Amino acid sequence: MAEKKKVEREFVEASTGKTSKGPAVVTAANKKSATGKRVAAVILWVLALAAEVGAILMLNGIWYIKEEQKMYWLIGALVIDLILVIIGSQLWKKANRLDPASKQSSVKFFLWNNMGLIASVICFLPIVILLLANKDLDGKTKKIVTVVAAIALVLASLFSIDFNPVSAEELADAQQAVGTGTVYWTRFGKSYHLDPNCHTLMRSSKVYRGTIEEAFEANRTDPCDFCALEQE
């Protein structure tokens, strides 16, 4: 049986992007970072709502646009709306991994982890309903813009849903297990590792390392089963 070729690995600091050959401990101001991301997300969602309002004003004729240009303006507003909603939702999800809500408050936990989805519905569902009810647009424009708006609603919702929400209790458990130590993860892996020499990491040429908070921010919220077993 051929011997597996040993991969030369480099370790990358998650906070700085710098590389080195040995382990290190990195601290992160996760609370401050999460607050900044949430503020930015809300600002982007407000701008997205403004784009939707602009589309509604164009649709109702309050903001005058020539009929032959109206379809392009409406689609442009919807695209801007979509981009802003998705970017805001990604920032909100990252903030939730840094500073997650507690499951003890089920209402807050639900709202915190579905805020992006709520923003998506608010920023697209009204315009979809108004398009369907509108009788002034020509048939072609109405059909195309309605389809674009519906697709945008679906895309925004899919990108905004957090399919793996993290609770404050899960983060606390991870912090207790790891302490102030360093955890490791790879670009395409789903877990964080407690041991830089875990056999599941040995074939990765680039290994990221950082605090448990940085691992959660990178959406690596599940501990490696092999590392956990070895640590017991």
Name each region found by the language model.
Residues 57-58, 89-93, 160:
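Juxtamembrane cytosolic interface motif at the C-terminal end of transmembrane helices
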Residues 108-109, 113-150:
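Cytosolic-side transmembrane helix boundary signature
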Residues 1-86:
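Membrane-anchoring hydrophobic segments
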Residues 83-99:
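Membrane-water interface of transmembrane alpha-helices
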Residues 146-161:
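Final/C-terminal transmembrane alpha-helix of multipass membrane proteins
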Residues 64-69, 99-106, 134-143:
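Membrane-interface helix-boundary motifs at transmembrane edges
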Residues 71-74, 96-117:
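Loop-to-transmembrane helix junctions at the membrane interface
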Residues 158-232:
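Mature, structured domains enriched in cysteine- and short glycine motifs
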